């Protein structure tokens, strides 16, 4: 009996950690950019955006399942695996991730400030400082990992419930949305790649994988749990994406005009008046603050293994990361050109990192006697090729803007 209780307790604890990793990944993906992109694409593609969401979900699952599985089996972080495949590559990926994480965190902290401005009428800078203090407090707590898991889960549920409520008030044409999801009137490759990059690109896909390692979940025996957790992470993101898509579609189908300078806020205001606008403020703050936490945690996890000192002081470095992003936003705002450059480079992280992990999956010195399924290798390779082509294309089109 005592043994059964212990086993049940262990299973519950393990499931809690797996859900924590899933929510950390999902809420890292659901940031200010996620809200804006979803509203903008729905406004332009209308019901056909359902097809874009469907394809991006499939590609996201292929990418994420590969990454988390190989990290768990090897028991090593992404940068360690990359260095074993090609010495020095891990450092290169780590630099890209940290630059991306820092630049996007300036945007995330700005989004959190904007959310509090909508809710309480304070300036975005004051809102950003308050949000930074809240994010820092999570890492000051002794059980920082558990606090982070719990916070991202609560924020995730709040965002989804509020967005579903607003979607219901707009009475979207669900039948039309379902029909267009499978037989679209318009297809946008750019929208698909943008969504995949925003959901599992950059540091985001490693957020949950590295969290599981920190919690001690690794080895071949953990594969079923890790796979389940990786898919749940994508599904949480997708539920939020679909709810927001339906909310925007409901507004668009009524012929109401969405303000292109702030599409997400405009949708909530048109859907539910001033109450809707306040709901947007809370969703924006939740989306931004969880992305601040996810970006800081994951970026630092990429440098942890390079030195025992970094490993020992990782919480202090995470706090420093949040402080630097906040000071950058408060003093210089969002540096547009830097964001363009880093955003372009960010598109290359997923194909480089995933490609490296797929090579690692066949190296005995990294994964032992583990056999990586062929269907995962081939689908992962497909994502690598698609995202590499689009990543290079984006880089070539965005870089000239820096000098214009």
From Swiss-Prot:
Question: What is a single Pfam family found in this protein's UniProt entry?
Answer: Nramp
Where do transmembrane segments lie in this chain? 15-35, 43-63, 84-104, 121-141, 154-174, 187-207, 231-251, 279-299, 316-336, 338-358, 373-393
Q: How does it sit in the membrane?
A: Multi-pass membrane protein
Q: Report the GO terms under cellular component.
A: plasma membrane
Q: Which GO terms describe its molecular function?
A: cadmium ion transmembrane transporter activity; manganese ion transmembrane transporter activity
Specify the domain of life of the species encoding this protein. Bacteria
Q: Which UniProt keywords apply?
A: Cell membrane, Membrane, Transmembrane, Transmembrane helix
- Which subcellular locations apply to this protein? Cell membrane
- Give each disulfide bond as a residue pair: none
Q: Does the keyword Endoplasmic reticulum apply?
A: no
Record-level GO BP terms: iron ion transmembrane transport; manganese ion transport
Question: Can you tell me which family this protein belongs to?
Answer: Belongs to the NRAMP family.
What this protein is called in its record is Uncharacterized membrane protein YcsG
């Amino acid at each position: 009996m005592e043994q059964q209780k212990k086993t049940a307790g262990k299973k519950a604890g393990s499931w809690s950690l797996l859900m924590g990793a899933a929510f950390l990944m999902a809420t890292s993906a659901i940031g200010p950019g996620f809200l804006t992109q979803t509203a903008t694409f729905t406004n332009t593609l209308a019901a056909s955006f359902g097809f874009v969401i469907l394809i991006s979900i499939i590609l996201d699952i292929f990418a994420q399942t590969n990454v988390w599985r190989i990290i768990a089996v090897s028991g090593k972080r992404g940068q360690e695996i990359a260095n074993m495949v090609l010495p020095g590559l891990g450092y290169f990926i780590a630099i890209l991730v940290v630059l991306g994480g820092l630049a996007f965190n300036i945007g995330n902290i700005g989004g959190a400030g904007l959310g509090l401005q909508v809710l309480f009428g304070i300036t975005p800078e004051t809102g950003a400082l308050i949000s930074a203090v809240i994010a820092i407090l999570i890492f000051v707590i002794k059980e920082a990992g558990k606090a982070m898991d719990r916070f991202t889960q609560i924020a995730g549920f709040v965002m989804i419930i509020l967005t579903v409520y607003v979607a219901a008030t707009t009475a979207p044409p669900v039948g039309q949305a379902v029909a267009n999801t499978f037989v679209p009137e318009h297809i946008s490759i750019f929208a698909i790649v943008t969504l995949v990059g925003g959901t599992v690109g950059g540091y985001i896909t490693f957020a949950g994988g590295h969290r599981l390692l920190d919690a001690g979940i690794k080895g071949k025996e953990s594969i079923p749990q890790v796979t389940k957790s990786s898919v749940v992470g994508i599904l949480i993101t997708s539920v939020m994406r679909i709810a927001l898509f339906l909310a925007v579609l409901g507004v668009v189908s009524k012929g109401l005009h969405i303000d292109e300078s702030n599409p997400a806020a405009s949708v909530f205001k048109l859907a539910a008046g001033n109450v809707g606008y306040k709901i947007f403020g809370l969703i924006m703050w939740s989306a931004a603050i969880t992305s601040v936490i996810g970006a800081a945690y994951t970026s630092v996890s990429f440098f942890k293994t390079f030195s025992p000192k970094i490993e020992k002081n990782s919480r202090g470095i995470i706090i420093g990361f949040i402080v630097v992003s906040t000071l950058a936003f408060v003093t210089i705002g969002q540096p547009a050109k830097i964001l363009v450059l880093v955003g372009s480079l960010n598109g290359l992280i997923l194909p480089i990192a995933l490609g490296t992990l797929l090579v690692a999956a066949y190296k005995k010195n990294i994964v032992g006697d583990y056999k990586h399924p062929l269907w995962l290798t081939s689908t992962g390779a497909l994502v690598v090729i698609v995202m590499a082509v689009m990543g290079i294309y984006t880089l070539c089109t965005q870089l000239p803007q820096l000098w214009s």
